[in-house]
Amino acid sequence: MSKPILSTGLRWLWLVVVVLIVDLGSKALILQHFALGETVSLFPSLNLHYARNYGAAFSFLADKGGWQRWFFAGIAIGICVLLVVMMYRAKASQKLNNIAYALIIGGALGNLFDRLWHGFVVDMIDFYVGDWHFATFNLADTAICIGAALVVLEGFLPSKQKATA
């Protein structure tokens, strides 16, 4: 028996589109206006720096010959399918989980597009303190991390709040 889409968590899929537009738009600007390795200081402790990531987070498996591109693409597709199913099964009123899932899906699809189109993920945000630099990342990574943090947060909320959060 099918449910009306707007009564499910799929009502929040618009957020996936927003994340994709912002992420892919920022990456397109970097690709058009930056040379590989170029850095522009925005604020103290924050640069724009064009980097290519052939692996996963923190360039994990980046030097493994190319198979990792398809491995991580498969993982992204699997996670997106799983989260869409979870959103379909959830009520639209379960805002926190549905927003979290939409952020993760949007970020995963943004990085998936890069992997399939370019063969690498475009990274550009360079956060640093003194001489210590955090791994360069992008807006898709940010959406995924915020989504994951919201899933963890939801796990700590009392049951009554979970139904309306």
Curated annotation (Swiss-Prot):
GO cellular component labels: plasma membrane
PROSITE patterns per record: SPASE_II
Catalyzed reaction equations: Release of signal peptides from bacterial membrane prolipoproteins. Hydrolyzes -Xaa-Yaa-Zaa-|-(S,diacylglyceryl)Cys-, in which Xaa is hydrophobic (preferably Leu), and Yaa (Ala or Ser) and Zaa (Gly or Ala) have small, neutral side chains
Group of enzyme by EC: hydrolase
Membrane topology: Multi-pass membrane protein
Chief place of localization: membrane
Keyword tags: Aspartyl protease, Cell inner membrane, Cell membrane, Hydrolase, Membrane, Protease, Transmembrane, Transmembrane helix
HAMAP family registered for this protein in UniProt: LspA
Protein name: Lipoprotein signal peptidase
Organism, as annotated: Cronobacter sakazakii (strain ATCC BAA-894) (Enterobacter sakazakii)
